[in-house]
Curated annotation (Swiss-Prot):
Protein name: ABC transporter G family member 42
Keyword Flavoprotein found: no
Record-listed ATP 2 binding positions: 837-844
Tissue: Confined to shoots.
Ranges of compositional bias, category Polar residues: 1-18
Keywords: ATP-binding, Membrane, Nucleotide-binding, Repeat, Transmembrane, Transmembrane helix, Transport
Any single Pfam family the record assigns to this protein: PDR_assoc
Compartments, as annotated in UniProt: Membrane
Organism: Arabidopsis thaliana
Gene Ontology CC annotations of this record: plasma membrane
């Protein structure tokens, strides 16, 4: 509030005297003191009244508002905005009045777009557009041969319009009509690959004249956030990077003009404006303001979380996405479906605040919504209605109904206008709104509507305004942004560093766990190589070389988790980069620098553990130098994996490239293949491998030590002789050259990381693929909607009753938290029940408890099905549960998903023909016929849209013929028409006599009144109403109207919105009643208890439902169905299977080239070591890649498995056996690739026996590593921990493979680990089958020995043990597969 000086003092005096504090003179003197201070101080100084947590105010005093602590800010906002509905409007009015009093014009933006066309290019394939292995290969070949077909799809088709300031515009339209594309285009965020024509301007300025990404904000449909950060931290960082815009300059100007005019502002408004204008601070008052108006205060300090980590709810995450954008100074907002997952009351509150912001702050706002309630719809000033990429109507909201009445269509009474608008343009729903009875109805196309609008007064006025050039002289450039970044380079670097450090603290468990594993592996290594260096001869020098290589390999593999961690954050980085929060270098530098202490610690721990115990040269200087090399190598390796993640970004592809990098670095590192043994034309590989420089540095540090200075017969020191044999003798000075090279590699990889983040395209959805056949068909299917769900399969109608249900969990702080409090009710056959309440009331929790899905917590109360205590196995068979989150196998089609569900959930006495008929009927009922051959895909990346995925979730449950169906928010994410389709089907299902319960958030009038009964809940899991709705919701309205002070329901308003509004916490406080207690004391509650008891007694008269088995199908049918699904999933997953086949081919080719024909001539031990090195390379690295890539594939399907297992679709053994068997054909193919490429190129001996052994050993290797990767997934809670354990497994199987330390030299206390390591048996079988029967004499370490004797003496391999090796090799995959099957059935990491 602003006023004259006297009024201002009087206001402040009244405000303070009520609390017994300052008088007028003291306040005036304080204000005068502020005005006398320098400008830079005055702008951060205000008269601030501190408050305690009880709300008690202290004396108002002069304070620096930039130094307010968290409690001060929170209590200040709580005092300013006690009730969001009213107080936010008052606050904005006071701010606007203060601005107006000094004559400042607020900057504003008018966004115009004219003849805007947007086209996308898609790939045309013959047959179904399914990404199979064959399609992937043929697509790559066709692109290579430039013969691929491409088709352009028009997304926006010549749209024009004006988004005006001080007004809020609603964007409506059916799915795929171009709403998101229009929002992206107007905000300057369209993908560059899209072809755009037309003009877009802000205040007459084209996008090339300013920075649109900083002038406007786009609120995405996708909730991308860093899961480790809290809600407050997410908003603080967003606010910090966005800066304060013109707030600071405006506050300075207001202060200057007020001083000249002698105006004393409201102290609280002055403090708020100054605190919100502070730049570069870690926290800002604006964060607390946004938390308050979005209703996020309750979870402000809760971490965001994700699928594998607990966090905030989906609705809270949606609000956080909105808050992240509006916390900054930008006033032009393009918001995409911001109400998904929110109840209608919360949506109304948020949009009310946005409306107040638009009108009082002159903001420009365009919002797309799916199902706006009538009250929410009326908040908007203007409306844009879209269809088929065109704008049908663009004008004032008030005139849209009259426009369509002129076209012959009228919105019925008690029909949501938004719902009417989306259905009237649909061919399938249009006819019901035809109002010209005297005329025969004929379908009015979208083109006809557009033509009529263009000829209307509104259309002509719009064209007239667009034809006039915007007068730039009227433009306030403060509204446009001409800088990419709000902060200085140094401030951006500090902010990114602060966030990176915080994330490292939040992930401290991962780093501690990783360091613990490193200590564990280090302990094993030092005891395996115990005092190896104490004997100085060429043989022990070879062992010492093995220990050095193992150290290097361990630190190399230790960097792999950095790859997965980086990929997991790439999506959030890309979003924030597009928003111009910061440049890539500001993100890359802290990522690199703050990991230096981790590298330092892990390298030091390894060196400290192993150096003196293994027996390296004991000088302290050499200890430090070895540590420095390992430190530099570790830095370069984690930098390399970061760079790979930034370049490739896809999990499977990046993991495969990471594995290839390990292969290349290891093979060219100078140990597996000696430098002299490399082909001369491939020696460049040696000089490009960081591992070779580390090898040079470590060996120079060790073998130029005095203790290796003994002169040999060749007149060289023993150390030089050892280095010469390996081709590593580059002189003593080579150590520092190697160290410098490793630092250079670190800098190079970090530069690549930064450049990749800067210049490579942002991660996006996969390229659209369409079928050639479908492309020739009409896009509109005229099939009728099934008016009835005609499924006539027999089922048992069941009553579900529950009494005094309580659910209590223990918080991390050890406190008891009650989420459900004495909930009592009944779900009856043929009755459609709605479960409603504000976000966080416990609706989903109640469904989870009643259905038996909770995995922790204490459940009390009585739950009965059919009058008998619920038996979970039986209940899972006869019930269906549509989860809030749509979890499906990504590589099946829509029809196959339904077929799979019907196959396993319908009993075996139902014929296949009947099952197919049911599947087709459900496809028709839920309107999935047109997309039945579409791949489900991964949410946000490929496949179905959100609303299609939601309909699939419902369809999958319907085909199971359940007696009881629970649906958790079945209409969330659907537009009004799709929601109506779904609810029509649900209503028809209930009318067949089934028991149906749905939780709902923001239903339209029609959807809400389709329900028969309502259970209304409040926070704390308490029921405040349970009973019938009545015609036009009369019963529930009558119940709440009895409460004194409840406002009447306005005519044509949505009863659901009204109910949520009057039962909100703030409304309850105003009324001064406890609605839950009022319900428990009501006559309705007593009547309900009697009805529930009668229902129980009636049900008890019937027979108890007993099923003959836990599953609908036999074990054999379960296995067949699971194998069918897994086969399709694998065949359609080229990113997994094609990638690992390519990797195997690459590794084999590399080995073939490096070891060309080396197996033919074996004359000394080094020749044998070369051949053994080729075997070791293929075995270890092909295994590593298979293990790494299978993790993500199995982890994706694990969530689907949890859902399907709960529904008793199959036994875990049937699922796991199918998962195990489906890997075999791909492993067979990889093994064949190995034999075809490696065998002739390396020059192995040709015989059926030897070829078979090579094939058999590699085949078992691949299965072992595949099954171990699958086992890792099922015994760990998330992929990140699985990846960390994986790298330690690689180190162990490397150490005990018999390559870096042969079996005879392994200490007896570790020999059992040799026998437990699968790689030791594989290498035994490969080498012994090739050379175990060879009697040729070779020179081995100065002695002549037969090859077979050398194998036994040096490696411990015996030819007569091959039969045992063969048995053990097949036993390993069988054991691992059995463990996988056991643990996937026993462990459940899904916390509910």
């Amino acid at each position: 509030m602003t006023m004259s000086q006297t009024d201002g003092v009087e206001f402040a005096s009244r405000n303070t005297n009520e609390n017994g504090h300052d008088d007028d003179d003291q306040l005036r003197s304080q204000w005068v003191a502020i005005e006398r201070s320098p400008t830079f101080e005055r702008i951060t100084t205000a008269l601030f009244c501190k408050r305690d947590e009880k709300g008690k105010k202290s004396q108002r005093r002069v304070m620096d508002v930039s130094k307010l602590d968290d409690l001060d800010r929170r209590l200040f906002i709580d005092d300013l905005i006690r009730h969001v509905e009213n107080d936010n409007h008052v606050l904005l009015q006071k701010i606007r009045k203060r601005i107006d009093e000094v004559g400042i014009d607020l900057p504003k933006i008018e966004a115009r777009f004219s003849d805007l066309f947007v086209e996308a290019e898609c790939e045309v394939v013959y047959g179904k557009p399914i990404p199979t292995l064959w399609n992937a290969i043929s697509s790559k070949l066709s692109r290579f041969m430039c013969s691929n077909q491409a088709k352009k799809i028009s997304i926006l088709k010549g749209v024009s319009g004006i988004i005006r300031p001080k007004r809020m515009t609603l964007l409506l339209g059916p799915p795929s009509c171009g709403k998101t594309t229009l929002l992206l285009a107007l905000s300057g965020r369209l993908d560059p690959s899209l072809k755009t024509r037309g003009d877009i301007s802000y205040n007459g300025h084209l996008f090339s004249e300013f920075v649109p990404e900083k002038t406007s904000s786009y609120v995405s449909q996708n909730d991308l956030h860093i899961p480790e950060l809290s809600v407050r931290e997410t908003l603080d960082f967003s606010g910090c990077f966005q800066g304060t815009g013109s707030r600071l300059e405006m506050t300075k100007e207001i202060s200057r003009r007020e001083k000249l005019k002698g105006i004393v502002p409201d102290p609280d408004i002055d403090a708020y404006m100054k605190a919100a204008s502070i730049e570069g601070s870690k926290t800002n008052l604006q964060t607390d303001y946004i938390l308050k108006i979005l209703g996020l205060t309750i979870c402000a300090d809760t971490r965001v979380g994700d699928a594998s980590r607990p966090g905030i709810s989906g609705g809270q995450k949606r609000r956080l996405t909105t808050g992240e954008m509006i916390v900054g100074p930008i006033k032009t907002l393009f918001m995409d479906e911001i109400s998904n997952g929110l109840d209608s009351s919360t949506t109304f509150q948020i949009l009310s605040c946005l409306q107040q912001f638009a009108r009082l702050s002159e903001g420009t706002i365009l919002v797309s919504l799916l199902q706006p309630a009538p009250e929410t719809f009326e908040l908007f000033d203007d409306l844009i209605l879209m269809g088929e990429g065109k704008i049908i109507y663009h004008g004032p909201r008030d005139f849209v109904c009259s426009f369509f009445e002129d076209c012959g269509f009228k919105c019925p009474n008690r029909k949501s206008v938004a719902e009417f608008l989306q259905e009237v343009i649909s061919r399938k729903d249009q006819e019901q709104y035809w109002c010209h009875i005297e005329k025969t109805y004929c379908y009015v196309s979208i083109e006809s509507f557009i033509e009529k609008f263009k000829k209307s007064d509104l259309g002509l006025e719009l064209q007239d305004r667009l034809s006039k050039t915007y007068d730039k002289s009227q433009t306030q450039k403060d509204g446009l942004c001409f800088r990419k970044y709000s902060l200085s380079n140094w401030d951006m670097l500090k902010a990114c560093s602060r966030r990176e450090f915080l994330l490292m603290k939040r992930n401290s468990f991962v780093y501690v766990f990783k360091s613990g594993l490193l200590i564990f592996i280090g302990f094993i290594a030092m005891t395996v190589y115990l005092r190896t260096g104490s004997t100085r001869d060429s043989l022990h020098a070879n062992y010492l070389m093995g220990s050095l290589f193992f150290s290097l390999f361990k630190l190399l593999a230790d960097g792999l988790p950095e790859l997965t961690l980086t990929i997991s954050r790439i999506a959030v980085f890309c979003k924030q980069k597009e928003l111009y929060f910061y440049p890539a270098w500001a993100y890359a530098i802290p990522s690199a620098i703050l990991k230096i202490p981790i590298s330092f610690l892990e390298s030091f721990l390894w060196t400290m553990l192993t150096y003196y115990v293994i027996g390296y040269s004991p000088e302290m200087g050499r200890f430090i130098r070895q540590f420095l090399i390992l430190f530099a190598l570790h830095l370069s390796c984690i930098s390399m994996f970061r760079a790979i993640a930034a370049v490739f970004r896809d999990f499977v592809v990046a993991t495969t490239v990471g594995s290839i990098s390990i292969v290349l670095l290891s093979v060219f590192g100078g140990f597996i293949v000696r430098k002299p043994s490399m082909p001369s034309w491939l020696e460049w590989g040696f000089w490009l491998s960081p591992l070779s420089y580390a090898e040079i540095g470590l060996t120079a540090n060790e073998f130029f030590a005095p203790r290796w200075g003994k002169i040999t017969s060749e007149n060289r020191t023993l150390g030089e002789q050892v280095l010469d044999a390996r081709g590593l003798n580059f002189g003593n000075q080579s150590y520092w050259n190697a160290f410098g090279a490793l630092i250079g590699f670190t800098l190079f990889f970090n530069t690549v990381f930064a450049l990749a983040l800067t210049f490579l395209k942002t991660s996006q959805r996969s390229r659209v693929i369409v079928s050639h056949e479908k492309n020739t068909q009409s896009s509109e299917n005229d099939s009728k909607i099934a008016s009835r769900f005609k499924n006539a399969l027999p089922f048992e109608p069941l009553t579900f009753t529950f009494q005094d249900v309580q659910y209590i969990i223990e918080t991390p702080q050890g406190k008891k938290l009650q989420l459900l409090s004495g909930v009592t009710g009944a779900f009856k056959p043929g009755v459609l029940t709605a479960l409603m309440g504000v976000s966080g009331a416990g609706k989903t929790t109640l469904l989870d408890v009643l259905s038996g899905r909770k995995t922790f917590g204490d459940i009390k109360g009585q739950i009965e099905v059919g009058g008998y205590v619920k038996v979970q196995d039986t209940f899972s068979r006869v019930s269906g549960y549509c989860e809030q989150f749509d979890i499906h196998s990504p590589n099946l089609t829509v029809q196959e998903s339904l077929k799979y569900s019907a196959w396993l959930r319908l009993t075996s006495n139902i014929s296949s023909e009947t099952k197919c008929a049911i599947v087709n009927e459900v496809l028709e009922t839920i309107e999935l016929e047109e997309i039945k051959d579409s791949i489900v895909g991964i949410p946000g990346i490929s496949g179905l849209t959100t609303e299609q995925r939601k309909r699939l979730t419902i369809a999958v449950e319907l085909v199971s013929n359940p007696s009881i169906i629970f649906m958790d928010e079945p209409t969330t994410g659907l537009d009004a028409r799709a929601a109506a389709i779904v609810m029509r089907a649900v209503k028809n299902i209930a009318e067949t006599g089934r028991t149906v319960v749905c939780t709902i958030h923001q239903p339209s009038i029609d959807i809400f009144e389709a329900f028969d009964e309502l259970i209304l809940m409040k926070n704390g899991g308490k029921i405040i109403y349970y009973g019938p709705l009545g015609q036009h919701s009369s019963k529930v309205i009558e119940y709440f109207m009895r409460i004194h002070g409840v406002p009447k329901l306005k005519e044509n308003s949505n009863p659901a919105t009204w109910i949520l509004d009057i039962t909100s916490k703030s409304s309850e406080d105003k009324l001064g009643v406890d609605l839950a207690q009022m319900y428990e004391e009501s006559t309705l509650f007593k009547e309900n208890k009697m009805v529930i008891e009668q229902t129980r007694c009636t049900s008890l008269g019937s027979e108890r439902l007993i099923l003959s088995s836990r599953y609908a199908q036999t074990s054999w049918e379960q296995f067949k169905a699971c194998l069918w699904k897994q086969h399709l999933s694998y065949w359609r997953n080229p990113s997994y299977n094609l990638t690992r086949i390519i990797f195997m081919s690459f590794t084999c080719m590399l080995c073939g080239i490096l070891f060309w024909q080396k197996a033919k001539e074996i004359n000394n031990q080094q020749d044998l070591f070369n051949v053994f090195g080729s075997m070791f390379t293929v075995v270890l690295f092909s295994g590593i890649n298979n293990c790494s890539t299978v993790l993500f594939s199995v982890a994706t399907e694990r969530n689907v498995f949890y859902r399907e297992r709960f529904s008793r679709m199959y036994n875990s053994w049937a699922y796991s056996l199918a998962q195990v068997l489906v890997e075999i054909p791909y492993s067979l193919f990889q093994s064949i690739v190995y034999v075809i490429i490696v065998y002739p190129m390396v020059g192995y001996h040709w015989s059926v026996f030897k070829v078979f052994w090579s094939f058999y050993s590699i085949f078992c290797t691949l299965l072992i590593f595949n099954y171990f990767g699958m086992l890792l997934v099922v015994v760990t809670p998330n992929v990140h921990i699985a990846f960390t354990l994986r790298s330690s497994f690689y180190a162990i199987v490397n150490l005990f493979a018999g390559y870096v330390m042969p079996k005879p030299n392994i200490p007896r206390w570790w020999i059992w680990m040799y026998y437990l390591s699968p790689t030791s048996w594989v290498l035994n079988g490969l080498l012994t089958s090739q050379y175990g029967d060879m009697e040729k004499e070779i020179l081995a370490f100065g002695e002549k020995k037969k090859v077979s004797d050398f194998l036994e003496d040096y490696f411990g391999y015996r030819y007569d043990s091959l039969a045992l090796v063969a048995v053990v090799l097949i036993a390993f995959p069988i054991l691992l597969a059995s463990l996988f099957a056991f643990f996937i059935g026993k462990l459940n990491f899904q916390k509910k």
